[in-house]
Amino acid sequence: MIEKVNPSHPDKVADRIAGAIVDLAYAKEDNPKIAVEVLIGHGVCHAIIETTADLDKAEIISAVHRIAGVMDTDIVIVPQDKHLSNNQKDGIRCGDNGIFKGMPLTQEQEELSRIAHDIYGRCPYDGKYIMDGVRLIICQSNVETVDLKRLYSGAEINPLGDWTGGTDVDTGATNRKL
């Protein structure tokens, strides 16, 4: 069984905010050392940032509002630990953050990705899609179930009923859905 979430899922929103904060660090210096964790939901965005860059909280808050809408923000910026920072100087990267990927997708994963992109192109709201062999479960917010049933007649669509989704009803955190 595989699962895919779309760009409006709260975990993906948290990832986009973290990415924007990293971009701000790169705008300040050539090779910043930075680690960002974001937790977002229910009208609040919490971000903890460990960095060598001199970041402006107002710019971070502006990025949060651009990506997720106006909400309360709790931004903590601290200097990166000097030992971690020193470990990052040369070719060997020995920090505590990293994402490694690079495996080929299975046919089932490719099909689910195609379905997820198709649905998100029509309904750009929070959604999750699960495929288990030939069984397809579509959980899509802010859409009439009957409308999706016309497109994917063999799928189980919103098996728990219609729902709203997004960060007003769910919480997202960085690096949970990659």
Q: What are these model-derived regions, one by one?
A:
Residues H42, G69-N175:
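Glycine-rich, mobile lid/loop segments that gate access to catalytic sites or pores
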Residues K12, R16, L55, E59, ...:
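Conserved active-site and cofactor/substrate-binding residues in soluble primary-metabolism enzymes
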Residues M1, A35, G166-D168:
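Short, flexible coil/linker segments at or flanking structured domains
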Residues I17-A20, A25, A58-M71, D147-Y152:
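Short, non-transmembrane amphipathic alpha-helical segments
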Residues I2-S8, E37, V44-T52, G98-G102, ...:
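Short glycine-rich or small-residue beta-strand-to-loop segments that form or flank ligand, phosphate
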Residues M1-K33:
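N-terminal, positively charged regions that mediate nucleic acid binding
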Residues E29-Q88:
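Conserved beta-ketoacyl condensing-enzyme motif
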